[in-house]
From Swiss-Prot:
Cofactor section: Mg(2+)
Function description: Catalyzes the sequential condensation of isopentenyl diphosphate (IPP) with geranylgeranyl diphosphate (GGPP) to yield (2Z,6Z,10Z,14Z,18Z,22Z,26Z,30E,34E,38E)-undecaprenyl diphosphate (tritrans,heptacis-UPP). It is probably the precursor of glycosyl carrier lipids.
Recorded family membership: Belongs to the UPP synthase family.
Reactions catalysed according to its record: geranylgeranyl diphosphate + 7 isopentenyl diphosphate = tri-trans,hepta-cis-undecaprenyl diphosphate + 7 diphosphate
Alphabetically ordered keywords of this record: Magnesium, Metal-binding, Transferase
Annotated binding of Mg(2+), by residue: D37, E226
Protein species of origin: Thermoplasma volcanium (strain ATCC 51530 / DSM 4299 / JCM 9571 / NBRC 15438 / GSS1)
Gene: uppS
Protein name as annotated: Tritrans,polycis-undecaprenyl-diphosphate synthase (geranylgeranyl-diphosphate specific)
Subunit (UniProt): Homodimer.
MF terms in GO: ditrans,polycis-polyprenyl diphosphate synthase [(2E,6E)-farnesyl diphosphate specific] activity; magnesium ion binding
PROSITE patterns, sorted: UPP_SYNTHASE
Cofactor note: Binds 2 magnesium ions per subunit.
Length: 258
C-alpha cells in the first residue's frame, strides 16, 4: 500500500471515530432489520469462489452484531436465507445450510453471547430446513431463551408473504375450532399468529448491494420502517457504512403514516 492509500485509511478512521461520537449523541433505532445481500456478486468481482463469499458474509454478521451492541441497538434481525433461496442449486443450498449450522455452533461457544446475554432466535418456516439444522437451532434457542439484554434474530426459510399466509391459515383453523371469533381479530391479535408475535417492528431496514427493494422481508412489520440502501456488497460492508445508515436514520422525522 502506498502513502496515499495509508493516508486514505487514516482519514477514513478519523471520520469513522467522529461519526461514532456524533451518532452516540442521538437516539438510535431499537430494532434494525438487515437484508444481507451481495455475497455472490462480491465473490465474482474479487475473483474468489462463491462459497467463500458466503463465508465472508457469515463473518460479517458477527461484526455487525458487535457494532449494534457498541451502539446499544437492542434488536437486530438478519435476513439470512429466504424462501426464494431454495430455488438455487442443491449444492449451494446444502453449503448454505451447513454454513448456517456452523454459525449456530459458533454462537453456542461464543463468550460474547453469554457475557452480553444475547437472545438468539430464528423466524421462518423451520419445517423446510434439514433435521440437523433444526436441532442446532432448537439447542441455540433453548440455551439463550432467558437472555434479554440483546436480541439477535435470523430469518431462515423466511418469506414475508408466506408468514402472512401462514398466519391467516392458523387463524382460520382456530376459528373453525371455535377458539377465536373472527370479528375480534385486530392488528394486535393478528400479530400473535406471526412467526414471532413479540418481535417489535423494525425502526430501520438496511439493505446492502445497491438493490432498492425489501424482497419479501418482514412485510407486515415494516409498514412504517425507515429504509436505507447501501451500494456496497455485504462482505465489504464496513463500520463506517453502518454508522452512515444509523446517522441517516437519526436525521429523519418519523411520521408513522400521520
Amino acid at each position: 500500500m502506498g502513502i496515499s492509500g495509508k493516508l486514505g485509511d487514516i482519514a477514513s478512521k478519523v471520520y469513522e471515530d467522529v461519526l461514532m461520537e456524533e451518532v452516540k449523541k442521538y437516539p438510535r433505532p431499537r430494532h434494525v432489520g438487515i437484508i444481507t445481500d451481495g455475497n455472490r456478486r462480491y465473490a465474482r468481482i474479487v475473483g474468489i469462489p462463491e462459497n467463500e463469499g458466503h463465508v465472508k458474509g457469515k463473518n460479517k454478521v458477527e461484526e455487525v452484531l458487535d457494532w449494534c451492541m457498541e451502539l446499544d441497538i437492542k434488536i437486530v434481525t438478519f435476513y439470512a436465507f429466504s424462501t426464494e433461496n431454495f430455488k438455487r442449486s442443491p449444492e449451494e443450498v446444502d453449503f448454505l445450510f451447513h454454513l448456517i449450522n456452523d454459525a449456530f455452533i459458533s454462537l453456542l461457544k461464543d463468550e460474547r453471547v453469554y457475557k452480553n446475554k444475547i437472545n438468539v432466535k430464528v423466524i421462518g418456516n423451520v419445517s423446510m430446513l434439514p433435521e440437523y439444522l433444526r436441532e442446532t437451532i432448537k439447542i441455540t434457542e433453548e440455551t439463550t431463551k432467558n437472555f434479554s439484554n440483546y436480541h439477535m434474530n435470523l430469518a431462515i426459510g423466511y418469506g414475508g408473504r408466506e408468514e402472512i399466509l401462514d398466519a391467516i391459515k392458523r387463524i382460520a383453523r382456530d376459528a373453525i375450532a371455535g377458539k377465536i371469533n373472527v370479528d375480534e381479530i385486530d392488528e394486535s391479535k393478528f400479530r400473535n399468529y406471526l412467526y414471532d408475535g413479540n418481535l417489535p417492528d423494525p425502526d430501520l431496514i438496511l439493505r446492502t448491494s445497491g438493490e432498492e427493494r425489501i424482497s419479501n422481508f418482514l412485510l407486515w412489520q415494516s409498514a412504517y420502517s425507515e429504509l436505507y440502501f447501501s451500494d456496497v456488497y455485504w462482505p465489504e460492508f464496513s463500520k463506517l457504512d453502518f454508522l452512515r445508515a444509523i446517522y441517516s436514520y437519526q436525521r429523519r422525522q418519523r411520521r408513522f403514516g400521520r
